[in-house]
Structure formats: C-alpha cells, structure tokens
C-alpha cells in the first residue's frame, strides 16, 4: 500500500504541493496578523538630504538682498595670494 501511495504522491506532486503551500501560507499570514494586532500608524517620511539642502538654500536666498552685489572693481584679485605666490619668496 505504501509504495502505491508514494508513487501517486510523486506523480501528482505539483498538484498536491500547491494547495498545501497555499493553505499553509494563508494560515501563517492570518496568524501573524492576529498576533501582531492592528497595523501601526504610518510614520512620516523624513526629508532626504537633497530636499533639506534645497530648503536651506531657498531660505538663504529669501533672506538676501539681491540688488546689493560686490563690484568687480572691488575685487582686485580673483585668486588668493597664497596660491599664486607660494613659490615666490620676493612677493611674501
């Protein structure tokens, strides 16, 4: 009797396995839901770093007066002296 049973189970394994797996999965899902309880309240998503940076830059722009800019005539050198005169001791 057992050899016939195992032959039938082996032959029809896909047809037997799927319903058994489906029932076990459904029972496990509902059991886990029952043990865990109600769904937790959704947590507010934290802003990403790029969003926080954009907000900070917008706040900085709002606080500035864009009509007051430094004249190019006031800027005598565009590069710092330390970079250009590093190897020239007579200029230091």
Curated annotation (Swiss-Prot):
Pfam families: UPF0767. One of its GO terms (cellular component) is membrane. The keyword Membrane applies. The chain crosses the membrane at residues 15-34. Coiled coil: none annotated. Keywords: Membrane, Transmembrane, Transmembrane helix. It is a single-pass membrane protein. It is found in: Membrane. Its main location: membrane. Belongs to the SMIM12 family. This is Small integral membrane protein 12. The gene is SMIM12.
